[in-house]
């Protein structure tokens, strides 16, 4: 770097000090060496069919940092705490049932929040070392945010698969940057969950398979983001969740008493815990205007509306029947019509048979299947 000897120890401290002034709550440093242990875990993860399909499928890219930045010498990991308490949250009552977005999607999309901080941190480093090479990543990058954070000393990976930070708990957004500067690495945090298995025991779908591993195919957070039919065995498991699931974090003892607020995370109770029936009426434009700033909107309105219909069935919400009938008979999307017919059958039982029979012949096979299923597999 220009042939000038760089005081990396002082620069590291300067970076740490600056990070805390721009809304970064925890920062750590590690090498750019391969994540060999992670490679073995990912190979088993894919072999067992646990992958969600949302993450980078190339294991080499996920575990070898220098494939992303050949000049990388270090990785700087950052964590930003996010709030988990919603002040003034409206109540969900009969006739006015509400859904819920997971806490990681509260406020402005966290990708935007994290990129802003990483860009500011990168600019600071570049002001000190103009010829430095940097590559930043947040969530959708190829590296494993959790593996990087753990090795950089931000926390340890708990049985729920989340990095548990001593001050922030699991309620954190994670990001990292590869840099061409050889910083002294921090030591990993020596801590563990001990004998605690509360998260494993309380997971609604038994998706936690031990040692911090997750079967994404059973995880409610993943299931709420899929665009197809919700598997039968999970339809009532999702409850009123519209996007994501926080159960394994809510029950974690390490999270007790923790609630981190950020100036740029503005909580809107009516949006984060919305009325279910009005949600079904939203056009694409209205959905984008209302929810487009949330991370939970990244898959579009169809999964959210499907989940809203399932939530109405979960609540056995008879007052929603007129709207569900309208959706079932007028919506252009087979998935949404089918889910609405299923929910009507679940809520009304035999009382729905005449309505379903009257519309049966005009539907295609996949919708007809859900119409029958709604009547014949009603939850008692």
Curated annotation (Swiss-Prot):
GO biological process: queuosine biosynthetic process; tRNA modification
Primary location recorded for the protein, binned into one broad class: cytoplasm
Cofactor: how and how many bound: Binds 2 [4Fe-4S] clusters per monomer.
UniProt subcellular location: Cytoplasm
Keyword Cytoplasm in annotation: yes
EC numbers on record: 1.17.99.6
Binding sites annotated in the UniProt record for [4Fe-4S] cluster 1: 193, 196, 199, 252
Keyword flag tRNA processing: yes
Active-site residues from the entry: 139 (proton donor)
Catalytic activity reported: epoxyqueuosine(34) in tRNA + AH2 = queuosine(34) in tRNA + A + H2O
Protein purpose: Catalyzes the conversion of epoxyqueuosine (oQ) to queuosine (Q), which is a hypermodified base found in the wobble positions of tRNA(Asp), tRNA(Asn), tRNA(His) and tRNA(Tyr).
Self-association and partners: Monomer.
Family per similarity comment: Belongs to the QueG family.
Protein name per the record: Epoxyqueuosine reductase
Gene: queG
């Amino acid at each position: 770097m220009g042939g000038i000897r760089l005081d990396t120890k002082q620069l590291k401290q300067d970076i740490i000090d600056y990070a805390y002034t721009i809304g970064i709550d925890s920062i750590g440093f590690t090498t750019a060496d391969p994540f060999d242990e992670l490679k073995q875990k990912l190979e088993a993860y894919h072999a067992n069919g646990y992958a969600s399909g949302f993450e980078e499928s190339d294991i080499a890219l996920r575990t070898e940092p220098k494939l992303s930045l050949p000049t990388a010498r270090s990785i700087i990991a950052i964590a930003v705490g996010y709030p988990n308490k919603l002040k003034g949250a409206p109540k969900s009552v009969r006739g006015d049932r509400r859904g819920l977005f997971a806490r990681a999607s509260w406020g402005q999309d966290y990708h935007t929040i994290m990129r802003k901080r990483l860009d500011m941190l990168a600019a600071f480093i570049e002001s000190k070392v103009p010829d430095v090479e940097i590559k930043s990543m947040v969530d959708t990058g190829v590296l494993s945010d959790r593996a990087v954070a753990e090795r950089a000393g931000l926390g340890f990976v708990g049985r729920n698969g989340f990095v548990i930070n001593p001050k922030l708990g699991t309620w954190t957004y994670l990001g990292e940057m590869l840099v061409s500067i050889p910083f002294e690495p921090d030591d990993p945090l020596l801590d563990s969950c001990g004998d605690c298995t509360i998260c494993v025991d309380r997971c609604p779908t038994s998706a936690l398979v031990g040692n911090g591993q997750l079967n994404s195919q059973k995880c409610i957070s993943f299931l709420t983001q899929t665009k197809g039919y919700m598997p039968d065995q999970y339809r009532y498991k999702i409850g009123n969740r519209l996007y994501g699931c926080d159960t394994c974090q809510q029950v974690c003892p390490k999270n007790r008493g923790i609630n981190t607020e950020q100036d740029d995370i503005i909580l809107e109770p009516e949006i984060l815990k919305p009325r279910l029936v009005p949600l079904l009426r939203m056009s694409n434009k209205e959905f984008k205007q209302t929810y487009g700033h949330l991370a939970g909107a990244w898959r579009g309105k169809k999964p959210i509306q499907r989940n809203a219909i399932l939530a109405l069935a979960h609540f056995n919400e008879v007052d929603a029947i007129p709207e569900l009938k309208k959706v079932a008979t007028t919506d252009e999307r087979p998935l949404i019509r089918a889910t609405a017919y299923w929910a009507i059958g679940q809520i009304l039982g035999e009382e729905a048979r005449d309505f379903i029979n009257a519309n049966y012949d005009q539907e295609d096979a996949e919708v007809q299947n859900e119409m029958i299923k709604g009547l014949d597999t009603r939850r008692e």
